[in-house]
C-alpha cells in the first residue's frame, strides 16, 4: 500500500491487517502518555482545499501522537487565492520535504492526480462525492467493536446517498468484510447505481432487521435548488425511534458528521446509548494512526 485513495483492488486480509494495527494504536491512545516515536523524523501535510473539522484535526492528532511533524495547509489563506494551481501548491510542499499528504478537495480525482505530482504517500481525505476511505475504515472499526464481526451483517445507510463519498467508500469496504449494505433515500438522492450496495427508496426495506444503521446528512452545498423539500424529507426519511424499531434490537447508530439534529436523525436518538457517534470520532484517530504507519514505516513499505 503506497497510497490510500479508495478500496479498489483491496483484499480482506489487507483491510484486516490495517484494522489490527488500529487496535494497537487504540491501546496507545488509552495510555497516560498517548505518544510513541513511530513517525519521528517524518513530515505529514494536511492539504485541505475544502473545509473540514473532524478529518483534518483527527489526522493532525494521529500524526502528532506518533511524533511526526505536521504542516497544516488552509486554502483560504494560501496562494490559491492568488491563482496558484493544486499541482503547484503540492509541488511547493514536495520541495519542502513532506513525506505524506492528506488531501481533501471538492473535485473528484484530485488525490489520484496528486500521486503523479509528488513522491510522498497520498491519502484521500475526501474528494468530491467520490471517496472518503479513512471514514469508511473508522466506521468498519467501530462496527466491529460493536458487533464482533461483519460477516453476514446487514448495514443500512440512510440519507443523501447521491452526494455522499462516505456511502460510496462504505459500499466498497464493508462487503470486503462480509457485510450486506442497503442504502435508502429519496429517489432524487439515490445514484443510478452504487457497486457493493443495494439501493432502495423504501426506508423500511433498508431498516428491516438491520444489524446497524448509518445516517447521513443532506449535503445542501452540493445540491441543486429544489432537489429535496426539507419537511417532506423529515416526514418520510428521518430516522426516528419508531422507524428504528424495524432494525434489530440495540442495533447501533452511526453518523459521519456533521449532524443536523432532528433532520436526518431524531435528536433523542443522537444522545441515546445506541449512538456510537463519539466512539467513531475516538476511533478515527487510531485508524488514521494505523494508515500513516502502514504507509510510512509499516507494511505499506
Curated annotation (Swiss-Prot):
Recorded metabolic or biological pathway in which this protein acts: Pyrimidine metabolism; UMP biosynthesis via de novo pathway; (S)-dihydroorotate from bicarbonate: step 2/3
Residues reported to bind L-aspartate: 82, 165, 217
Keywords, ordered alphabetically: Pyrimidine biosynthesis, Transferase
Domain of life: Bacteria
InterPro entries per UniProt: Asp/Orn_carbamoyltranf_P-bd, Asp/Orn_carbamoylTrfase, Asp/Orn_carbamoylTrfase_sf, Asp_carbamoyltransf, Asp_carbamoyltransf_Asp/Orn-bd
GO cellular component: cytosol
Catalysed reactions listed for this entry: carbamoyl phosphate + L-aspartate = N-carbamoyl-L-aspartate + phosphate + H(+)
Pfam families per record: OTCace, OTCace_N
EC number assigned by the record: 2.1.3.2
Biological processes per GO annotation: 'de novo' pyrimidine nucleobase biosynthetic process; 'de novo' UMP biosynthetic process; amino acid metabolic process
Molecular functions per Gene Ontology: amino acid binding; aspartate carbamoyltransferase activity
Binding-site residues, carbamoyl phosphate: 54-55, 104, 132, 135, 257-258
NCBIfam families per record: asp_carb_tr (TIGR00670), PRK00856.1 (NF002032)
General function of this protein: Catalyzes the condensation of carbamoyl phosphate and aspartate to form carbamoyl aspartate and inorganic phosphate, the committed step in the de novo pyrimidine nucleotide biosynthesis pathway.
HAMAP family per the UniProt record, alphabetical: Asp_carb_tr
Record text on subunit structure and interactions: Heterododecamer (2C3:3R2) of six catalytic PyrB chains organized as two trimers (C3), and six regulatory PyrI chains organized as three dimers (R2).
Family statement: Belongs to the aspartate/ornithine carbamoyltransferase superfamily. ATCase family.
Protein name per UniProt: Aspartate carbamoyltransferase catalytic subunit
Organism name: Thermus aquaticus
Gene name per UniProt: pyrB
